[in-house]
Amino acid sequence: MKVEKTVWNGKEGYLLQNESMEVFVNPEDGMNIYQMDWEGRQMIAWEEERYQRKATYGVPVLYPTPNRSEELKIQAFGRQYDARMHGLVKNRPFEVKAAEADGQTALVTGVLLWNEAQPDFPMFPFPSILSITVKALPDEVVWSYEVENCGEGEMSYGIAVHPYFNKREQAVKITVPAASVMEMTEEKIPTGKLIPAGETVPDLRTPALVDSLSLDHVYTDCQAGAHAEIFYNDC
């Protein structure tokens, strides 16, 4: 196991390595996982073109408003705030608090202080600390987070990751262990109303070809302990 600070594709960040995994994380760019290789296969591939045009790439962190909201507004504790799809932190710099390796694990932990020094604080005026850890294990990458409420009142938030897995020119299939899907408007705003999976969009509890799907939906009502899965021909 090894972790080192390095320059990769012209970007400074941290390379986590073991016998089967290589994971490059850039704390200065929202703790984004730029690339993830497993046994020589690029499972998440760096996309310079998307980076240059400021699109999403890698594994961006979406916090505190990961999804769309009606008229770009959210309601919280009796007040209305401006919102932004994909959140406010996906390109913000995180401070590295740990970068270490032992015989089983290589990891990097980054921390973002969300306070009045942040340019978008008025959009989410709740002082807090977001900590993210990316950990490389043998044949596994674990992404985890913690949110600490530093304010005096209540705080609510949403968080998600948006991984760009590489199809690698294969007939990739996916499963999602969700029994329901949220209804959404023509503008793709989730309404919160749940409908059975398969009624209007595919039921992904059985494998489906990615190339056959066109989805921008919220799948939910998941079986406890189950995971979404991606199936490659050579894995």
Tell me what each language-model feature is:
Residues 1-4, 77-138:
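Extended, loop-rich substrate-binding clefts of extracytoplasmic carbohydrate-active enzymes
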Residues 154-155, 164-235:
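Active-site/ligand-binding surface loops and adjacent short beta/alpha elements
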Residues 27, 114-157, 161-168:
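Acidic, contiguous internal or C-terminal segments within carbohydrate-active enzymes
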Residues 42-55, 88-93, 175-180, 190-193:
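Glycine-rich, pocket-lining loop/helix-strand segments that form or immediately flank
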Residues 1-60, 64-73, 80-84, 226-235:
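Beta-strand-rich N-terminal accessory domains
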Residues 25, 35-36, 110, 142-144:
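Short hydrophobic/aromatic-rich beta-strand segments that constitute the beta-sheet cores
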Residues 6-9, 65-67, 89-92, 125-129, ...:
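Short solvent-exposed loop/turn micro-motifs enriched in small/polar/acidic residues
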Residues 14, 104-108, 141-143, 228:
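Hydrophobic residues embedded in beta-strands of well-ordered beta-sheets
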